[in-house]
Each structure stands twice: as structure tokens, then as C-alpha cells.
Amino acid sequence: MGNKKTLEGKVAIVTGGASGIGETAARVFANLGARAVVIADIQSELGREVAESIGAKRCSYVQCDIGDEEQVKSMVEWTATTYGALDVMFCNAGIMSKAESAQTVLELDMSKFDEVMRVNTRGTSACVKQAARKMVELGTKGGAIVCTSSPLASRGGYIDTDYVMSKHAVMGLVRSASMQLGAHGIRVNSVSPMAVLTPLTRRMGLATPADVENAFGRFTSLKGVALTAEHVAEAAAFLASDEAAFITGHDLMVDGGLLCLPFFAPTS
């Protein structure tokens, strides 16, 4: 994104900021001039390490399970009290099912379904709600909320029904919140990345960038470019910045043209 400080002076929260896309976003936000970045995550050791590497004056870690709204409320309140502002909320934390099955409709493990919904749907909703309430209370000018969604929110899936459903719910939240919060000058958007190497994809057995490319590259029309966490973080930073001042209710696809291609059935 170059050296332009598009987030100069802003106070931002990044949920799931201890690893993966969230960690990269925390670093990108800081590099783009954010006055403070708060990492909210359940991974305390990793969260503290990331915050320390960015710098104590620029970044803090707060332990927060976003599925617990009281923890989200406390984290948002701590941020506003500590830094005197809240300009950006990047609702990035999310999980995939840990079920032994593929979570097809016929095999749906409802206890694992509930775990996914607790984080991806309830947790994201709590983050949007509490951030928006604080922005309204503070009279934040140009407040921005960005959620991590998925290209699957525009399609169905052969597996991982609970994850697909959760991302459809996130898109409903983004569209509704953008309509309701526009009167307060708060923009709400989402970023939908194709699969990228993160701890989440490693748990799927994809341990290297080459593994991810081999698994998903055939589904993109854009060739010769491998998606990185930096690409996703920079897309989120754009939506969070004043350069996107008239953009709200939008889902920014970072999918290499996935949705431009005909639909492919699985080969096995």
C-alpha cells in the first residue's frame, strides 16, 4: 500500500489479531499510521508477543473471547478509556468447525455447529454492536467497521455447512448495520478473502503457501499471483480509511476472480 499514512491518528481494534490475517492487519494498520492498535484475542501469549513486536506505545493486547458479549463490551470500553477514541473496528476473529465429520447437512454435528455460530455470528454481532455503540457515544467522525466474511457467503458449499451459514449471517449483519448506522456517519463493510495460509488453513492440513495454491488456485481466474495475508489486511485497511469515505454496505472480494468463474463441482 506504499508509504501513505491512510490511518494516521486512528485508534483501531483488531479481533483475532494474535495470528493469521488479524496479526498482519495489526501490523499493516500500525504501519499506515494508526495511533493505537488493540489486539483482541484469546491467544494471550501470541497476542502479547505481537503487541510487543509492534511497540508498546502503538499496540496493546487485551484478552477477549468475542463469543462473550460482556468481554467484548469491556474490551471496547478499555480501548476508549485508554486511548480516548475508537475509530476502527476490524471484526476478524473466526473459526471453522472442529467436527470429525465434513459438516454436511446429513452429518451436521450440532454441538460443533453451535461453537462456530457462537464465534462467527454471535461474536461478530457483539463486536459490531459494542463498537458502534461506543462510536455513537463518543461522537466519532468517520467511524469504520470492517468484518471478515468469505466468498462462500455468496454461494453454498458441499461441506462445512455451519461455516458457510455463519458467513452468510455476517453479510446480513454488514448490510443491515450499514443501513442503520449511516445516520451516525459510521460505515460498515466486509472483506471476503480466498483461502490464505493461516493457522486456520493449517488445521485443514494446508501447511505451506504451495499447499494452499494447489488446493484452491484452480478456482481463481487470476494466475501468477498467490494470495497473502498482506493482500487481505491492505483491503481491510482501505475500507477502514478515509479513502473509502463514501463506501458502506460493500463486500470487497479478495478472491482472485473466484466468483467470476463458472461453478465447479468437486472432482472427488
From Swiss-Prot:
<dbReference type="Pfam" id="PF13561">
    <property type="entry name" value="adh_short_C2"/>
</dbReference>
<keyword id="KW-0413">Isomerase</keyword>
<dbReference type="InterPro" id="IPR020904">
    <property type="entry name" value="Sc_DH/Rdtase_CS"/>
</dbReference>
<dbReference type="GO" id="GO:0016853">
    <property type="term" value="F:isomerase activity"/>
</dbReference>
<feature type="binding site">
    <location>
        <begin position="163"/>
        <end position="167"/>
    </location>
    <ligand>
        <name>NAD(+)</name>
    </ligand>
</feature>
<keyword id="KW-0520">NAD</keyword>
<protein>
    <recommendedName>
        <fullName>(+)-cis,trans-nepetalactol synthase NEPS2</fullName>
        <ecNumber>5.5.1.34</ecNumber>
    </recommendedName>
</protein>
<feature type="binding site">
    <location>
        <position position="92"/>
    </location>
    <ligand>
        <name>NAD(+)</name>
    </ligand>
</feature>
<dbReference type="InterPro" id="IPR036291">
    <property type="entry name" value="NAD(P)-bd_dom_sf"/>
</dbReference>
<comment type="similarity">
    <text>Belongs to the short-chain dehydrogenases/reductases (SDR) family.</text>
</comment>
<dbReference type="GO" id="GO:0016491">
    <property type="term" value="F:oxidoreductase activity"/>
</dbReference>
<dbReference type="InterPro" id="IPR002347">
    <property type="entry name" value="SDR_fam"/>
</dbReference>
<feature type="binding site">
    <location>
        <begin position="65"/>
        <end position="66"/>
    </location>
    <ligand>
        <name>NAD(+)</name>
    </ligand>
</feature>
<comment type="function">
    <text>Functions as a non-oxidoreductive cyclase to promote the formation of cis-trans-nepetalactol. Cis-trans-nepetalactol is then oxidized by NEPS1 into cis-trans-nepetalactone, which belongs to a family of metabolites that are both insect-repellent and have euphoric effect in cats. Binds NAD(+) as classical short-chain dehydrogenase/reductase (SDR), but does not utilize it for its redox-neutral cyclase activity.</text>
</comment>
<feature type="binding site">
    <location>
        <begin position="41"/>
        <end position="43"/>
    </location>
    <ligand>
        <name>NAD(+)</name>
    </ligand>
</feature>
<feature type="binding site">
    <location>
        <begin position="196"/>
        <end position="200"/>
    </location>
    <ligand>
        <name>NAD(+)</name>
    </ligand>
</feature>
<feature type="binding site">
    <location>
        <begin position="16"/>
        <end position="22"/>
    </location>
    <ligand>
        <name>NAD(+)</name>
    </ligand>
</feature>
